[in-house]
Amino acid sequence: MAFYGVAKRIVQVVLWPFYKVEAEYRAELPQNKGYIMASNHVSDMDPVMLGLAFHKQLRFMAKEELFKIPVLGRIIRALGAFPVARGKGDQTAIQNAVKVVEDGGVLGIFPEGTRFKDGKLHRLKSGAVVVASKTGADLLPACIQYEKRRFLRKRVKVTFGIPIENSALGLTGQSKTELRAANKLLAQGIAGLLGVEVP
């Protein structure tokens, strides 16, 4: 955690000439339990911007290829990220995600599964609600929006919404029907912050 704080400060200094990150919190967030933050996905910079905006350490899943890059792999692992094999139903990554939440951490997930630059919210994959089902954790909808400008100090707005309590998700098990319904609630939360239609 100490390394994370130092690294976050260094990143803030390095990126200051290029990005102005603004955070908005729509509600008071849980302090003494783990939960899942789920956001739209626009850019490779999203984990960094969300990390700068958020008041606690975020533990992100990251594609496994990044961990094979010398130096970078060690840095992102030290910052608390862990690998996921995309498109393979990676059970080890799910287990790691569950452990983050059960240990009282905040898990960061991009449920769309990949980046989209069209300003819309796309169909969500089930990873976030699967972890919620396994842990009893709440879901925190979030969104990230980049100002469309080419010059220095691009404005980045990060909005953290109202947590969706686990009891409202209706997850008595892991049936496809329950997961779809819970995903719909999460999509509504993210889409509402973005001001777009629910996929």
Map each language-model feature to its residues.
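Short, flexible active-site-adjacent loop segments at beta-strand->alpha-helix junctions, enriched
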Residues: 27, 41-42, 54, 64-66, ...
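A generic structural signal for alpha->beta connector loops
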Residues: 18-20, 57, 78, 104, ...
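Short gly/ser/thr-rich secondary-structure transition/capping motifs
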Residues: 16-24, 88, 142
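Catalytic core of membrane glycerolipid acyltransferases/transacylases, capturing the structured
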Residues: 3-9, 16, 29-88, 96
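Secondary-structure boundary/capping signal
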Residues: 22-23, 58, 139, 198
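A generic local structural motif
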Residues: 20-26, 45-47, 94-96, 126, ...
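Non-catalytic C-terminal accessory region of glycerolipid acyltransferases
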Residues: 2, 92-199
